[in-house]
Regions:
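Residue(s) in the substrate-gating loop at a strand-loop-helix junction
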Residues: 81
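Short C-terminal tail/terminal secondary-structure segment
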Residues: 32, 164, 175-190
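Substrate-binding pocket helix/loop in short-chain dehydrogenase/reductase
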Residues: 4, 32-35, 39-44, 144
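A conserved structural motif in NAD(P)-dependent oxidoreductases
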Residues: 148-159
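Active-site helix of classical SDR
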Residues: 58, 97, 105
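Catalytic Tyr-X3-Lys loop
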Residues: 19, 36-55, 77, 101, ...
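Alpha-helical segment proximal to the catalytic Tyr-Lys
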Residues: 63, 110-111, 172
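Short, small/polar-rich loop/turn modules that mediate ligand/substrate recognition or access, typified
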Residues: 73, 113, 118, 174-176
Length: 190
């Protein structure tokens, strides 16, 4: 957390004022398994990156946004996970971290809306990245069997297509919106 302010200062000295932050910090549970066996060090590791890192990075960027007049639209975009709202007891630390990051996004949205800064949350589902490599084999058949109504893994470009209108202000009145990017995975089914 101590490195956040110097990092943002360095970025702004090189690139100019930040108008959009996409907070995409995320690490999986170090050890998947029974939540009753989670060790404090593993819990802290996941929450330090997935929650504390995202929160304090957004806080510093928001402070800097508020410290200068705006000529461009400004936005904070939190990339959390469908796990913010879909519990998995074998990855409880991850789910807890993403649920807390979701609440942080909502709090920032309420705080920054009067200042004209949009805050959004994206909840990716099963996205084909390095982070999903270890779960790919066990989810292929489940996806083919209907777990994801769209019938496929999400791609990083699916996230990008949602981020762009948020960053450009095309969704400014939707501040605080939670947008699932999961091919229908999180749709409740009966």
């Amino acid at each position: 957390v101590a490195k956040v302010a110097p990092l943002i200062a360095e970025i702004e000295s090189t690139c100019g004022p930040i108008t959009t932050l996409v907070s995409n910090a995320g690490v999986p549970s170090k050890i998947a398994g029974d939540m009753l066996a989670i060790e404090p060090a593993n819990f802290d590791f996941v929450l330090d990156i997935n929650l504390r890192g995202s929160f304090f990075l957004a806080q510093e960027v928001a402070r800097r946004m508020l410290a200068r007049p705006a000529s461009d639209y400004r936005a904070l975009i939190f990339v959390t996970s469908v796990s913010a709202g879909m519990v998995s007891v074998d990855r409880a630390d991850y789910c807890i971290s993403k649920a807390a990051a979701s609440m942080a996004a909502e709090a920032f949205a309420v705080r920054l809306a009067p200042e004209g800064i949009g805050v959004f949350e994206l909840r990716p589902g099963l996205i084909e990245t390095e982070m999903s490599d270890e779960i790919r084999a066990r989810h292929e058949a489940r996806i083919a069997g209907g777990l994801v109504p769209a019938g496929r893994w999400g791609q990083p470009a699916d996230i990008g297509r949602v981020v762009v209108p948020m960053a450009l202000g095309a969704m400014d009145f939707a501040t605080g919106a939670i947008v699932p990017v999961d091919g229908g995975l999180s749709i409740p089914r009966r």
